[in-house]
Amino acid sequence: MSNVDELEIDKFSQLAHKWWDKDSEFKPLHEINPLRLDFIDRHASIAGKKVLDVGCGGGILAESMALRGAQVTGIDLAKKSLKVAQLHSLESGVPIDYRCVAVEDLAAEMPGAFDAVTCMEMLEHVPDPESVVRACSTLVKPGGWVFFSTLNRNAKAYLLAVVGAEYVLNMLPRGTHEYARFLKPSELGRMARHAGLGLQTLSGMGYNPVTRIYSLNDDTAVNYLMATRRAD
């Protein structure tokens, strides 16, 4: 069975034209991107490295990594989002190899091809996140880095990420997230371990609604980032 939720694909396809509008539904992604980029670069030193961005969407993270000197491949199954990413790459003059392919299929085609793999804000949108984690591990070279970011599953995450962000503050469209698909760090850590990835860093990501600034912290109750490394 394909590890694709067509409703999720359709959801992001309808918003595809807004990916690079920093005042749109994608504003939070633009705001957290510098934080994500620094977290990735601090661990993997991506300049000159081959990096794969899984679930790249409109290319926000992919372009920023390319601007840091990485050789970036971005993959997504939402064709409209991918077309936006390709056009923006051409307009920006930032070369990125974008492909419409499932991560599991790419893993079968290109095992061990990348120095680092990123899978950010994507696991909570697929039926089988463990399949994605395994594929990411297969795609990275021995000793390479795999980065994940997703949402914890608890009452606080539900109140802030679903009720607060989607229904009170209107930061995200209603229905963006399905709470049952949120992943506890322990669950994601277990998936990573079973895939041959060792946990290196676990960090929370917080948002101050007054200053409108995101920062890394020790609170993983809602959003969190995980840096893992494949054994040599």
Curated annotation (Swiss-Prot):
The keyword S-adenosyl-L-methionine applies. GO terms for biological process: methylation. It is an enzyme of class 2 (transferase). Pathway: Cofactor biosynthesis; ubiquinone biosynthesis. It comes from Chromobacterium violaceum (strain ATCC 12472 / DSM 30191 / JCM 1249 / CCUG 213 / NBRC 12614 / NCIMB 9131 / NCTC 9757 / MK). Keywords: Methyltransferase, S-adenosyl-L-methionine, Transferase, Ubiquinone biosynthesis. Gene3D superfamilies: Vaccinia Virus protein VP39. PANTHER family: METHYLTRANSFERASE, UBIQUINONE BIOSYNTHESIS O-METHYLTRANSFERASE, MITOCHONDRIAL. SUPFAM superfamilies: S-adenosyl-L-methionine-dependent methyltransferases. It comes from the Bacteria. The lineage of its organism: Bacteria, Pseudomonadati, Pseudomonadota, Betaproteobacteria, Neisseriales. S-adenosyl-L-methionine binds at R36, G55, D76, M120. Pfam families: Methyltransf_23. HAMAP family: UbiG. Belongs to the methyltransferase superfamily. UbiG/COQ3 family. One of its GO terms (molecular function) is polyprenyldihydroxybenzoate methyltransferase activity. Its EC number is 2.1.1.222, 2.1.1.64. This is Ubiquinone biosynthesis O-methyltransferase. It catalyses: a 3-demethylubiquinol + S-adenosyl-L-methionine = a ubiquinol + S-adenosyl-L-homocysteine + H(+); a 3-(all-trans-polyprenyl)benzene-1,2-diol + S-adenosyl-L-methionine = a 2-methoxy-6-(all-trans-polyprenyl)phenol + S-adenosyl-L-homocysteine + H(+). CDD domains: AdoMet_MTases. O-methyltransferase that catalyzes the 2 O-methylation steps in the ubiquinone biosynthetic pathway. InterPro entries: SAM-dependent_MTases_sf, UbiG_MeTrfase.
